[in-house]
Amino acid sequence: MKAIKRLGFPYETQDPFLFCVYHKDDYPAGDDKMQAPRQGNGADFDWSQPYRMYHGERIPGLPQRPHRGFETLTTTLEGRVDHTDSMGCGGRYGDGDLQWMTAGSGIVHGEMFPLVHRDRPNPLKLFQIWLNLPAKHKMVAPAFVMHWSERIPKVQSQGASVTVFAGEFQGATGLSPPPNSWAADPANDVAVWYIALDAGKSITLPVSKLGAQAKRSLYLTNGAGVEVGSRAMEKGFFAELRADKTAEIKAGSAGKVASAAG
């Protein structure tokens, strides 16, 4: 363990990661146009409310905006995302799917959160993580890959589950990233894991292939708190871990954490 720090917005990250946010919105039932009951104000990030419109007007989300020189990983846990981009691509994904996009020389894309259910709420839970590109690949052509939930590896043990969005965990290897990604080189040992623990259960994070050179972050997103080794970490905090040593994560109440390393 290196340090435990308070979470901000966006989450603090370590190289090669540039940015991380966790969206948790309790959207109500939508109307016949998949809209929310209220209109957005153009920049709705009010965390005191049950849900946010972000930059959307009637459908919440993040309309068209430019990216260049890095990658975005949109890891969905619950809810739907509508993707459109300047390459002419578009589609809907969610409920455990991962979109991994290489912005490269530049792309404009939008991610909206349609309220697809008219007869029940539309909860949304997802992470968006930005991963730097190697210098030699900064200006490659933009591209993306879709990893569908049913194909994403999951490790199950008694009272614990790990979704392997990237990297390797206990013999399970994540699906292939885009070819120009920092994560495409196994020597970089990039990993993104989503971990769910029942109350009182634990799991041990392995040593990185990079040893002390790797930088590993652990974000607590749900639950009152966890023990990281011998130290307690409450909700609203994250840990910078030593990657050259194993780390036992134990939940007091049921908890969910995300780990990013590289």
Residue ranges, per PLM feature:
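Jelly-roll (double-stranded beta-helix
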Residues: 1-262
